[in-house]
Amino acid sequence: MVAANLEVPTSSSSSAATKRQKDVDNKLEKCLNDMLKLKTSSNNNSTSNSNNNAIMSHSLTGEHKDPKTALEGPTSSSSSSSSKYIGESQIPVPVQLYDPQKPLLQQQQQQQRICYPIGKSNSTSQLPMGGYQRLLQHQQQQHHQQQQQQHQEQQQYPQHKRPFLNWNSFACSAMNGASDPFMQQQHMPAHQQQQHLPHKLQQSYSSSHVPKQAPKSGLAMFLQKNTNKENKFGQPMQQQPPGMMPQMYGYQAPQQQSKIGYPRTGAPLTHSASFSSAQRPTALQFHQQHQQQQHLQQQQQHPQQQQHQHSSFGVGMMSRNYYNMPKQPERKPLQTFDPYAYPKPNQMQPVKYQQQQQHPHTQFQNASAGGGGGGAAGLQYDPNTNTQLFYASPASSSSNKQPQQPQQQQQQQQSQLQQSNSVIFNHSGQQHQPHQQQQNEMSKSALGLHFIETAKPVIQDDADGHLIYHTGDILHHRYKIMATLGEGTFGRVVKVKDMERDYCMALKIIKNVEKYREAAKLEINALEKIAQKDPHCDHLCVKMIDWFDYHGHMCIVFEMLGLSVFDFLRENNYEPYPLDQVRHMAYQLCYSVKFLHDNRLTHTDLKPENILFVDSDYTSHYNHKINREVRRVKNTDVRLIDFGSATFDHEHHSTIVSTRHYRAPEVILELGWSQPCDVWSIGCILFELYLGITLFQTHDNREHLAMMERILGQIPYRMARNHTLYSKTKTKYFYHGKLDWDEKSSAGRYVRDHCKPLFLCQLSDSEDHCELFSLIKKMLEYEPSSRITLGEALHHPFFDRLPPHHRVGEVSNKQPLSSGSSSRERSHSLSR
């Protein structure tokens, strides 16, 4: 279109106005003659030239003399070649086109926009014929092309930093059914694209020496212009050859919204994907300008050859689309993604890769033009939909820019899918998976991405080293967290659901602390040894199903059990267990720990919290003595858990083991320990199950020893002397063979008031109760060598009343009653 503007002469002299008018008429006649010559030499543009002649003849009749009628009169027909002469100082003005070959009513209905200069000038260069003079001057065309070339070269550099991209505005409109303006522009016919091309004001560049980045085409440009106020008036979108970009981006229908999915389960994304200014896409390295012009000419002359070359994914495609094919943005790991949001990828079916070998459209890769940390984007042919798909790969695998062989491409694609969990997008709305085809909902921010490279979830720990998780998180691509079961010094235990077996299990998540991680490895080793000796769990030790290292957190999967005997006791308001239930639980505990001792393994952390019911269902009944309801567990089958502190005889023995309330005296006095320390702990447990209270409720070593003497009698002199001679601790608890303890102090009065001899704690003088306390007294012997072994305990009269169906296994009389040699236990426990 040609810019025109006529002004009324302001001179007072009529002669000067007449002279100027004659000068204008001469120029118009000269221009008309030139246009007539151009008409005879041009055959392709006969129709447009005839219109121009009509317009010029109409202008010569004198309409240009009146400035009011000039704005409505002579104009030139709109064409794509003349649209490039629109200056920055021009604004579009709707006018009517005059065509003598068409009816007047039809011409009045057609409205077009013609840009006229802004401002006033007395020069005649702003007359309507100035546009035709520029068309005839070839030097001005070359000068204009050079300016465009310099303008594009200046835009190849990065832009200034801009505000944070807000994807929600576009995502919300997309989810409400708003179509993509980029897709609308690409699917329009060529003549409609020219008519609908927006005439926007050119953005004036600042005086800064930092150049701007090239305008982005497509969806990236749409998001940039709608989310950045600084670039609200950006450069207009440059046109692309029809049918080029839809094939490159895999679009088939602008009405159908794209869907994303995962290679395995198709779980939807759950977090927003927003990128800061440091993670913006970088510009693509373009070819030289003369090569670009050559390819553009080849496209116009040979459209069929262009389509064939585009299907081969050669270098020519990059040069032909240098201004509308920006480099794919670099995607960094999303720091807000949750662990369960990304299921474990599986290998693609070999049939799909065999189909890709048969097609020449195998791969097209672009190496990352920026620094490290970015990813490479490519195109992949889909034989089912006859479209091309984007795929993302990590930066480590995109260093090679040369085309690869089909077999190497298959291996690389499989490794990339396994390592980076790449998501392949089909913009037609269909996702191809080996086992299922499922369309998933997308997160709001993911709607604005052509492709996305999924990253490994970022694992966060709290100040104590516990793993931060939420209900519904999926660990190790298999175990879905359902609830938290308990917490300890080692970590937490959660209830998980095995997604493969559809079965609930218990998952022990160890703290991300070195000492607890090493202890977990020892526990796994002990559980594996136990599984070798007892594959069917006949000896009542918990069964380990699986284990794995989850980002520094050792995780062990166990069978799902019920409450611990301590938790059930606490929920029952510390109402003690009936004696028959205590007998059955004590028998199972002795039987299970004896199995460990027979295999030269010491548990070292026996307590009610580590004894779990297989099923903690209960019945309630009213107790008239205490005037309230009490619970009674239905099934007293138990399992032994927590082998984190289990120690083999040949392994290093820590100085302090066991929980305070169940710690044996040889451990407190640092005289060495072995299997008898477990027997002491079992004696304390039986007392607690029987009475519902802890036998030694203290947190101080000296007070603990004072309670022992108050309940069990004086500590032997030999142990006191050995403690004084061999103990490495600076604190000495004995003076001249006696415990250094002030009974008149507040702590001494507390021990005297709350502790009493063991046999005075019996609830009844019946034979059953006396047999239980007899067993407890033998388990609480000071001397480890004098302490009863678990083999002997299983033959204690207290277990004679146990029903046959409660006996796990008959203990043969021919087997040694002790769990190992008594001399070995005594020598090891008193090795100092």
UniProtKB/Swiss-Prot annotation:
<feature type="compositionally biased region" description="Low complexity">
    <location>
        <begin position="40"/>
        <end position="53"/>
    </location>
</feature>
<dbReference type="GO" id="GO:0009306">
    <property type="term" value="P:protein secretion"/>
</dbReference>
<dbReference type="InterPro" id="IPR000719">
    <property type="entry name" value="Prot_kinase_dom"/>
</dbReference>
<feature type="region of interest" description="Disordered">
    <location>
        <begin position="1"/>
        <end position="86"/>
    </location>
</feature>
<keyword id="KW-0844">Vision</keyword>
<dbReference type="GO" id="GO:0045752">
    <property type="term" value="P:positive regulation of Toll signaling pathway"/>
</dbReference>
<dbReference type="GO" id="GO:0043484">
    <property type="term" value="P:regulation of RNA splicing"/>
</dbReference>
<feature type="compositionally biased region" description="Basic and acidic residues">
    <location>
        <begin position="823"/>
        <end position="832"/>
    </location>
</feature>
<keyword id="KW-0597">Phosphoprotein</keyword>
<feature type="region of interest" description="Disordered">
    <location>
        <begin position="179"/>
        <end position="215"/>
    </location>
</feature>
<comment type="similarity">
    <text>Belongs to the protein kinase superfamily. CMGC Ser/Thr protein kinase family. Lammer subfamily.</text>
</comment>
<dbReference type="GO" id="GO:0002225">
    <property type="term" value="P:positive regulation of antimicrobial peptide production"/>
</dbReference>
<keyword id="KW-0723">Serine/threonine-protein kinase</keyword>
<dbReference type="GO" id="GO:0005524">
    <property type="term" value="F:ATP binding"/>
</dbReference>
<dbReference type="GO" id="GO:0005829">
    <property type="term" value="C:cytosol"/>
</dbReference>
<keyword id="KW-0539">Nucleus</keyword>
<feature type="binding site">
    <location>
        <begin position="485"/>
        <end position="493"/>
    </location>
    <ligand>
        <name>ATP</name>
    </ligand>
</feature>
<keyword id="KW-0963">Cytoplasm</keyword>
<keyword id="KW-0808">Transferase</keyword>
<feature type="compositionally biased region" description="Polar residues">
    <location>
        <begin position="8"/>
        <end position="18"/>
    </location>
</feature>
<comment type="function">
    <text>Dual specificity kinase involved in the negative regulation of microtubule-based transport through phsophorylation of the microtuble-binding protein eEF1gamma. May function in the control of alternative splicing by phosphorylating serine/arginine-rich splicing factors, the SR proteins, including x16. Negative regulator of the copia retrotransposon element of the white (w) gene. In the eye, it is required for normal pigmentation, photoreceptor cell development and for organization of interommatidial bristles. Also essential for embryonic segmentation and differentiation of the nervous system.</text>
</comment>
<feature type="binding site">
    <location>
        <position position="508"/>
    </location>
    <ligand>
        <name>ATP</name>
    </ligand>
</feature>
<keyword id="KW-0716">Sensory transduction</keyword>
<keyword id="KW-0217">Developmental protein</keyword>
<keyword id="KW-0829">Tyrosine-protein kinase</keyword>
<feature type="compositionally biased region" description="Low complexity">
    <location>
        <begin position="137"/>
        <end position="158"/>
    </location>
</feature>
<feature type="region of interest" description="Disordered">
    <location>
        <begin position="809"/>
        <end position="832"/>
    </location>
</feature>
<dbReference type="InterPro" id="IPR017441">
    <property type="entry name" value="Protein_kinase_ATP_BS"/>
</dbReference>
<dbReference type="GO" id="GO:0005783">
    <property type="term" value="C:endoplasmic reticulum"/>
</dbReference>
<dbReference type="InterPro" id="IPR011009">
    <property type="entry name" value="Kinase-like_dom_sf"/>
</dbReference>
<dbReference type="GO" id="GO:0106310">
    <property type="term" value="F:protein serine kinase activity"/>
</dbReference>
<dbReference type="GO" id="GO:1902513">
    <property type="term" value="P:regulation of organelle transport along microtubule"/>
</dbReference>
<dbReference type="GO" id="GO:0007601">
    <property type="term" value="P:visual perception"/>
</dbReference>
<keyword id="KW-0547">Nucleotide-binding</keyword>
<dbReference type="GO" id="GO:0000381">
    <property type="term" value="P:regulation of alternative mRNA splicing, via spliceosome"/>
</dbReference>
<dbReference type="InterPro" id="IPR008271">
    <property type="entry name" value="Ser/Thr_kinase_AS"/>
</dbReference>
<comment type="subunit">
    <text>Interacts (via N-terminus) with x16 (via Arg/Ser-rich region). Interacts with eEF1gamma (via C-terminus); the interaction is probably direct, is transient and leads to phosphorylation of eEF1gamma by Doa.</text>
</comment>
<dbReference type="GO" id="GO:0004672">
    <property type="term" value="F:protein kinase activity"/>
</dbReference>
<feature type="compositionally biased region" description="Basic and acidic residues">
    <location>
        <begin position="20"/>
        <end position="32"/>
    </location>
</feature>
<dbReference type="GO" id="GO:2000255">
    <property type="term" value="P:negative regulation of male germ cell proliferation"/>
</dbReference>
<feature type="compositionally biased region" description="Low complexity">
    <location>
        <begin position="347"/>
        <end position="365"/>
    </location>
</feature>
<dbReference type="GO" id="GO:0005634">
    <property type="term" value="C:nucleus"/>
</dbReference>
